Amino acid sequence: MEISALQIARAAYQPKLPKALQGPVKAVEGEATQSVGNQEEIKALFPNTYGMPVITFEAGEKKELPAFNVGVILSGGQAPGGHNVISGLFDGVKALNPKNKLYGFILGPGGLVDHNYMEITSEIMDQYRNTGGFDIIGSGRTKLEKEEQFEKGIEILRELGIKALVIIGGDDSNTNACVLAEYYAAKKYGVQVIGCPKTIDGDLKNEQIETSFGFDTACKTYAELIGNIQRDCNSARKYWHFIKLMGRSASHIALECALQTQPNVCLISEEIEAKEMSLDDVVTYIAKVVADRAADGNHFGTVLIPEGLIEFIPAIKKLIAELNEVLTDPATGESREFANAEEQIDFVKSSIAKDNLAVLESLPEDVARQLCLDRDPHGNVQVSLIETEKLLSRMVAKKLEAWKEEGKFEGSFSAQHHFFGYEGRCAAPSNYDADYCYSLGFNASCLIANGKTGYMSVIKNTTAPAAEWIAGGVPITMMMNIERRNGANKPVIRKALVELDGAPFKFFAAHREEWAKNSCYVYPGPVQYWGPTEVCDQPTKTLKLEQGK
């Protein structure tokens, strides 16, 4: 395999560890924990793994441990740093006993169920250190939810002599890890399950998890591209760039990219929902910024749009909820079948409430058809297929035309469209993510060595130098509550949304009027791996603002 000069040089980078993990450790137990919501229900569902204490690791004395094997799974969408979680786990497991083995299950949780695996040797591991992607073993979206899956899993775990399984994933994957840990504990199978927090969307965080890995690198990658567009925008001075960014459930990426690049407009889904703004309100807000800048002779600008914006507009959210109900067959839980598209649209229009029908008919015809017709296998609207950036620019253009006829707008408006998603998922990890991910993996090996199960590996205090980071573990049940998913109440890890009273949003809100009126663009440039600390090792602005740095 031919590799680039950068990858060769980057392979030599030795990720930094918290001081506590640089030698033998001892586990210090805190108070018993409770779930963030629905305590009685969660306790009843997880009697063997509920109420466990938070763990903090400190320097300890070396212990001789018998050899054991560990399995690892990459679950869900890719995020920069996944390979470093595995390399940290590999090095940690080998440090405990050189005879220990690490097995990777191929293409996600499905590899566990289908008994598809490989041993990760030092020769294989060394090819992937400090690289982006999940290609060492691949990833998948199989959900571990059924007892037959758990039983198929234990067959191969026993065959390979695996004592512990590490699941690297987001909120849904770690919810499944918690369910699996509880099942194996209840059955007394003797297999530990540990989670590691991953998602570039940044929505797996709470008082215990400062950030999910990959968020830092992905945001810096998108911010470079936005900065490049803004430099072009300020050079040609004739286009408005509508840029959609990943983040269906939360607007963390859009907010962080705004803090890094200072665009003219950044929409925050959570604010739009809180203010109960309509789609027309959003369009009017953007159009006013365009008109005000045009009055100053600036016929250009940038608009950042979170991927999930549409689902946060209350009227459309209500419409989508009813569409999901009427287009799902209650008998099967699957999508209803129709002879043709027109029959389906007629059924929708005759089935939904009048206020929802009015919202549907207010949308551009192609978007309304898309909402009615594009479904997933469960009958749910495929919101991610809606090109929100194009929808908004078309509606802004229409409003500006109306204003021009009324004499309220003089100027030109020409739009360009972008969607940044896959560009950031497999980028080579920043120094922050390389260190953070390696520490998460190494820390997971310490949780295994201390006999823990149903825990998530956590590293805190990450705005400080790596030596001062705090390593430990948190019971996954602590992060859970009951939510309605696909028509049923289920225990899930609560997603973290942008907090409108939090420091990152408040900083943005205090500056956005100035950024809207003036061209205050910042050009972050590409992720840097070598050079001064202020260039190479800085965490996200979100994290620094949250910690008052």
What are these model-derived regions, one by one?
Residues 1-23, 316-321, 333-549:
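C-terminal non-catalytic interaction/assembly regions of soluble proteins
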Residues 24, 30-63, 112-163, 200, ...:
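Glycine-rich oxoanion-binding loops at beta->alpha junctions
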Residues 79-89, 112-113, 145-150, 171-179, ...:
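Short glycine/serine/threonine-rich phosphate/pyrophosphate-binding segments
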